[in-house]
Every structure is written in structure tokens, then in C-alpha cells.
């Protein structure tokens, strides 16, 4: 099966986080300071993951564990203009030049919306955070699991369409494996919710002894204990959103024009020779990007795959390299959709960003942006005014 490496390529929001706490990978529009053309040539190498006999293949994902970080220097405050947060002429999707949102970014928003916004305003700080030891260990653990079931072979890509084609070919390779009862890893999912295109990558799909289709999400932790209820809420939202996207694909809700229009991809683009060759090896005959998209959508919607039956989160201790425990996540579709609608209302420009409530102000102590956060400063100002008002009436 084919898989996308990041060698000489921008970090991609398809490569969603799967094994840490609440960090996100910068998406294809990771920085508002430096942007790639919406449509252009991209030369480099992607990679093909050729599965070993027992299973499927995967995308390389990064990890999340996020303890207290070095505070942002005061010099960074000067670079953050008020209009960056409160400019109303364009929606945040437009201001940050986002064609889509990743599940990872929405999970960051679940933890703290202001932090997710500052991550986009200050991408250099985010990149530094991703180099921490805990994140690197999480990556290594996750990669070792991938390499248990797949080999990696490079594939030459020339355009953005080639890069996306590699990911679609991954899906086409994994679908029959999953239908046959095999375990697959790093399964891409996508869909349109509230008019916004959302992408993610499911860590693992498999059938249990009851015949239920199970989504398993790996999370590595520094602490040899299960996470707090606040972090558990983020993780449950993540797997719930994956289920919404996966179920939508198998139900045939995704249309090809959603992909072309939202991601600004050229439907008539001829696939590169390397991509066509690997597609042929998989028994897929597609000359253009549109032909490949059509093949994928027909295959997944007409497959024998059911909707996901069970969501579980597997916690793994970095220090001992052993399991901590597995949590079965509840799924309430109405609740997930309601939360998602609220989060997306910020990105579509219907409201201003919000920080944490006073009951969760403890999150600020481990936040990179504690010293520059406008929400936090305003909350302190309001609290001081309320305290002064109360004192004056004593």
C-alpha cells in the first residue's frame, strides 16, 4: 500500500495525531507567514507502504503529550496584533488561508480554542514544541507499530494531485483488507460538516470477536496513569469525529466535487508516471485525478464495510513501553454534532474565539501562550474589577 512521507513536502493535515495528548501537526496552510500556491508543481518523494502478510499500512503521524513549556518571550507579544484575532472582514478560514480543517486542530480547539488560534499565529513556537523529547518518543512508538505490518517504498510525486492520489490509493488498498477481516492502520477519512471540509487519519480499524468494527486510537503518555477527565473529553471527541467521517464515507455522503472545490485540486490533472505505476500494481486503473477520486468513492460506498460499532482509546506508557489501559469511548451523535457545530462557528466567522472557563484556568499554567493570551488578560481584568466592586460594598 502507498503512504505519504514528508520528505521535501509540507506537513499535511491528513497526517493527524494519533498517539499523544493535545498537540497538532501544522496543516498544509501551517503558517500565515509563508504559503504555498494553491495550485502548483511539487517535486519530491512520497512513499509506498507494502504491507506484510497480516495487515495493512499507514501514514506517519506525530504525537501529542504536552506538559509545561517554556514561556513565550515578551518580544513575541509585540508581533501579535489585536487585529490578528479580531479582524472581521474575513472569516478565520479565509484569514488563515485554510481550505480544510484537520481533526487534530479541532481537538486542540476542544482543549482550548485560544491556544489553537495562537498555534496558527505563532507557527514557529508550535514547531519548537513538536521537537520535545516526549513528542519524539511518541512518534517512535507509533512508527514501530506501523513497521510491524508494512514496508515503505518511495514514490515520485510531481503535483499536489499526485500527493493526494497516494493517500487515496492507500484507502483503496486497505478497504479489501478490512473487508477480509484484517487489521488496518492509518486509514484516511474526510467529509464536509457544516460546509467545512474536515480531514483525519484513523489510527487502527479491526473486527473484534463479536464481529463489530472497532476503531482503536493509540495515545502515549509520560505518566503511567490514565488521563484527566479534561483530556479524556478531548480524546472521546476525536474518535467520535473519526466515526462521523468514516460512516459518512461508507454511506456515500461524500461527492467528488467536495474534494475538488474545497481543496482546490485539479480534477483533470494527469497523474504522474510513478503514481500511475503504483496504482496499476494495486489493480487500479486511473489516468487523471478525477478518475481516481471516482474509483475511491464508488469503492468505499459500495463496499461491505459497516459503520464503526465501537470506539476505544488505548493508553501506552512511554517509560515502561507497556500498556496503561484501554478506554471504551461513548458515542452520542447529537452531542458530537452539536459540539462540532459550535467549534466550526468560529472558523466560519460567526463568533470570536474563546478561551477556557474559569473552572479550567489550570490549563493556562502549561500553555505556551500564557503571557500573551488576550482571553486570559481580559478574564483577570474582569475578576479584578468584580473583586474591587465587591470590596467597595463591604
Curated annotation (Swiss-Prot):
Major location category of this protein: nucleus
One GO cellular component, as annotated: cytosol
EC number, UniProt record: 3.1.-.-
Keyword vocabulary terms for this entry: 4Fe-4S, Cytoplasm, DNA damage, DNA repair, DNA-binding, Exonuclease, Hydrolase, Iron, Iron-sulfur, Magnesium, Metal-binding, Nuclease, Nucleus
Keyword Amino-acid biosynthesis among UniProt keywords: no
Annotated [4Fe-4S] cluster binding sites: 112, 364, 367, 373
Top-rank lineage group of the source organism: Eukaryota
One BP term from GO: interstrand cross-link repair
GO molecular function, one term: single-stranded DNA 5'-3' DNA exonuclease activity
Biased composition (Basic and acidic residues): 61-79
Cofactor(s) this protein cannot do without: [4Fe-4S] cluster; Mg(2+)
Cofactor note: Binds 1 [4Fe-4S] cluster.
Pfam families on file: Exo5
Record's keyword annotation contains DNA repair: yes
Region: Disordered, residue numbers: 42-79
Localization annotation: Nucleus; Cytoplasm, Cytosol
Gene3D superfamilies associated with the record: 3.90.320.10
PANTHER family: EXONUCLEASE V
Similarity comment: family membership: Belongs to the EXO5 family.
Quaternary structure, from the entry: Monomer.
Function, as annotated: Single-stranded DNA (ssDNA) bidirectional exonuclease involved in DNA repair. Probably involved in DNA repair following ultraviolet (UV) irradiation and interstrand cross-links (ICLs) damage. Has both 5'-3' and 3'-5' exonuclease activities with a strong preference for 5'-ends.
Name of the molecule in the record: Exonuclease V
Name of the gene encoding the protein in the UniProt record: exo5
Amino acid at each position: 500500500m502507498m503512504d505519504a512521507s514528508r520528505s521535501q513536502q509540507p506537513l499535511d493535515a491528513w497526517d493527524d495525531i494519533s498517539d499523544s495528548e493535545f498537540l497538532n501537526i501544522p496543516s498544509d496552510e501551517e503558517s500565515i507567514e509563508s504559503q504555498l500556491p494553491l495550485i502548483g508543481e511539487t517535486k519530491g518523494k512520497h512513499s509506498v507502504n507494502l504491507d506484510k502478510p497480516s495487515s495493512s499500512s499507514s501514514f506517519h503521524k506525530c504525537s501529542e503529550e504536552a506538559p509545561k513549556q517554556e514561556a513565550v518571550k515578551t518580544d513575541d507579544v509585540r508581533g501579535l496584533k489585536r487585529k490578528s484575532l479580531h479582524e472581521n472582514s474575513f472569516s478565520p478560514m479565509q484569514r488563515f488561508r485554510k481550505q480544510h480543517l484537520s481533526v487534530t486542530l479541532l481537538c486542540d480547539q476542544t482543549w482550548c480554542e485560544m491556544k489553537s488560534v495562537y498555534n496558527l499565529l505563532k507557527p514557529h513556537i508550535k514547531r519548537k514544541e513538536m521537537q520535545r523529547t516526549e513528542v519524539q518518543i511518541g512518534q517512535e512508538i507509533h512508527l514501530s507499530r506501523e513497521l510491524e505490518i508494512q514496508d515503505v517504498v518511495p514514490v515520485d510525486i510531481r503535483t499536489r494531485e499526485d500527493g493526494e492520489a497516494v493517500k487515496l490509493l492507500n484507502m483503496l488498498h486497505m478497504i479489501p483488507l478490512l473487508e477480509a477481516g484484517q487489521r488496518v492502520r492509518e486509514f484516511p477519512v474526510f467529509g464536509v460538516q457544516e460546509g467545512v471540509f474536515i480531514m483525519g487519519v484513523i489510527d487502527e480499524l479491526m473486527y473484534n470477536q463479536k464481529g463489530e468494527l472497532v476503531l482503536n486510537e493509540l495515545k502515549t503518555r509520560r505518566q503511567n496513569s490514565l488521563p484527566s477527565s479534561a483530556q479524556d473529553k478531548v480524546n472521546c471527541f476525536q474518535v467520535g469525529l473519526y466515526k462521523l467521517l468514516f460512516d459518512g464515507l461508507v454511506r456515500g455522503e461524500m461527492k467528488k466535487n467536495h474534494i475538488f472545490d474545497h481543496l482546490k485540486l485539479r480534477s483533470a490533472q494527469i497523474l504522474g508516471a510513478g503514481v500511475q505505476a503504483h496504482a496499476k500494481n494495486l489493480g487500479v486503473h486511473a489516468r487523471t485525478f478525477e478518475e481516481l477520486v471516482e474509483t475511491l468513492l464508488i469503492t468505499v460506498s459500495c463496499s461491505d464495510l459497516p459503520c464503526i460499532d465501537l470506539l476505544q482509546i488505548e493508553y501506552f506508557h512511554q517509560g515502561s513501553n507497556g500498556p496503561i489501559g484501554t478506554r471504551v469511548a461513548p458515542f452520542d451523535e447529537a452531542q458530537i454534532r452539536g459540539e462540532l457545530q459550535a467549534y466550526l462557528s468560529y472558523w466560519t466567522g460567526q463568533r470570536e474565539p474563546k478561551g477556557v472557563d474559569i473552572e479550567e484556568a489550570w490549563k493556562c499554567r502549561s500553555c505556551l501562550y500564557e503571557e500573551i493570551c488576550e482571553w486570559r488578560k481580559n478574564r483577570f481584568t474582569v475578576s479584578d474589577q468584580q473583586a474591587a466592586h465587591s470590596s467597595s460594598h463591604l
